Amino acid sequence: MITVIISVDPSTKFLFDIVKSLKSNSIKFELIEVHPNNASYKNCLDKIKELPENNTILFLGHGQDNQIYGGELLNGYPKQPLVKRNEMGIFKNQNLFLLACDSASLIKSSFRIAKTNKAIGFGPLPTEIEEVENDKKLANEGITLDTIELFKQAINETVILSLLEFFKDESKDFIFLKDYLNLHLNKRINKAILEEDNRNLADLLFNMKNDMVIY
């Protein structure tokens, strides 16, 4: 069984392309949208608690090293923590894929609490210009809004290809998803360097691959 959880938020709208691609390729899954209101947050948590063990859960949204977030409405409902580090046990005995900033650190620090079968997470994923401006290293490298838009497209492209390959072979263990991600990120990095001459995009993709963990 596959469950996709996506936080509804203007800045994560691009991630709905992943949902659309799974649907168009006839991948069966349950979709849980976390809208910017208390009832939707609670509904999501209630549904997670009811999931059978050994489910594959994909979370698409924002995160920090101590939590993942639900939906946000600008000037209306600021994003709230959906699951904090000490609450990660809600994913016990599940296969967890967290496409969210700093989810690698969250997975590492909550490993004993969460007791997931396996979990995949990432480091920083700068998808907004403010995130670049707040990171001196990225700002000094000259990462532009255009680079960020290309990075968002590349995230979707590599994640979609990896998920489709993984889900279409039901005999594969969850750890193979990381192998597919490494493969497609490497291909996209090579394309950025050799065909597009875009070193900044290649660096962002390299960091995404390098910071990815499985626990």
Model-derived features with residue positions:
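Mature extracellular/periplasmic domains of secretome proteins
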Residues: 45-54, 82-89, 109-114
